[in-house]
Every structure is written in C-alpha cells, then in structure tokens.
Amino acid sequence: MNPNCARCGKIVYPTEKVNCLDKFWHKACFHCETCKMTLNMKNYKGYEKKPYCNAHYPKQSFTMVADTPENLRLKQQSELQSQVRYKEEFEKNKGKGFSVVADTPELQRIKKTQDQISNIKYHEEFEKSRMGPSGGEGMEPERRDSQDSSSYRRPLEQQQPHHIPTSAPVYQQPQQQPVAQSYGGYKEPAAPVSIQRSAPGGGGKRYRAVYDYSAADEDEVSFQDGDTIVNVQQIDDGWMYGTVERTGDTGMLPANYVEAI
C-alpha cells in the first residue's frame, strides 16, 4: 500500500517518493519550511523532523544567566562537592594497581581448572619425593630401615666367603705371561696383560627384576626393570644374593624387587 505525503497528504507513488526524516514526501513537496525552496537529499537539514535549507536552519541559542551571589554560591558549592568526591575516590583506590574483573561463569571454570592442575602437580611432586630416585611403576616396595639392615649385614660379611657361588664372576689374570723375544739387536716388546671377566654361569635359580634398584652399599648390586638375576641364593625373607646377567655384577639385592622365572 502506498503511503501518504507528509506535506499535502496525498498518496505518494514510488516514482516520486522521497523517504526522509522518518516520513514520505513528494519530490515537489520536499522543500524548506521557511523559503519553500525545493530540497534534495544532499542539501537539506532536518530540525524537529522538518526540512530546512542551509540559510534558514534554526540556530540554537543559549540563555544568559546573571552572575548573582546565589548563582556564584551554587557554582562554588558544586566545585567543592566535585573535589570532595574526587579525593574520596582517589583515597579509596589508592594503592590498588588492579582492575576489577567480573566473576563470570567462564572465569570460574578457568579458575577451577587451574586449581585442579595445581593439585595434580603437587601430588606428582609428592609421590616422586616419597618414592625417591629408584621409583618404578605404581607404589615402590618399602625398604627395611637402617637398623634392620645392619643387623644381618654384619654376620653376612663374616659368612660371605662360604656363600660365594662357584660360578660367580671373578677377575682372573693369566698365569703365563708372554716373554719378550729378541732377534739380533732388536727386542720385541711384551704383549699387554689383559684382565678378563668370566661370563656368569647359567646354573642356579633365575629371577627377573620387576623394579629398578640402585645399590645403597658396596656389597649390593644395581639393576633395571627386566634384568635377569642368576645364581640366586636366599639369605633371609628380605634379601638375596645373586649375579646380574646383563652387567655381571654380583652382590646382595632386595627380595621384593625380583620375581622367580
């Protein structure tokens, strides 16, 4: 349905319609309110939803107020109130170098996630410090205290020569050393003496390590998870004596770190 003209009230057809100032006009009816000069979309100026030309556009005027004692007092009072409020706000925010952030659901979720990550890291560090440098998978088997260890190590050192397996690796030195031979005036240097370690024997009981272990004393051996322990002899419920097949080292090892094959 075609609208009516805001000036003459007649129907405005699309071919002569001007849409401006929230109203519809005929092109001929869209003129200045004062001088009746026809206007267009480029040279009109609107005031109170009425078109004006540049020359007759209403100018805004300001009312002069006399500087009476009462007005001066109100002006001074307003300035004092502004200064008081400014100082109050300044003192209240003094020393605060942060801006207030709204506690939105997204920020609450991020804060909760950070707290969970901090708790996880704390528990990881706590478990590592409790397990020590030789921690394996899961909970580390508890070691006997130093008093229990010293109670059976002393008699073991006295009986150790009687319990060394016959197949334990020892350092052997060849009984016969090559003699330097001389040919005329030249003397051939003797070959260097080599110290060989005999391979561990395959007899006796065989165990497999289920945890990593670092030797805490000279009479103990170190091994890794998965190493094979051969020539194993049971000392008591907590300790064994055997040879690590991978390294050839022989000594004491905790019984709860290995399992029978």
From Swiss-Prot:
Gene3D superfamilies cross-referenced by the UniProt entry: Cysteine Rich Protein, SH3 Domains
Residue spans of biased composition, Low complexity class: 167-183
Keywords carried by this UniProt record: Acetylation, Actin-binding, Cytoplasm, Cytoskeleton, Ion transport, LIM domain, Metal-binding, Methylation, Phosphoprotein, Repeat, SH3 domain, Transport, Zinc
Regions that span the bilayer: none
Compositional bias of kind Basic and acidic residues: 121-130
Modification sites for N6-succinyllysine: 112
UniProt GO molecular function: actin filament binding; metal ion binding
Cellular localisation: Cytoplasm, Cell cortex; Cytoplasm, Cytoskeleton
Protein name: LIM and SH3 domain protein 1
UniProt organism field: Pongo abelii (Sumatran orangutan)
Gene assigned in the entry: LASP1
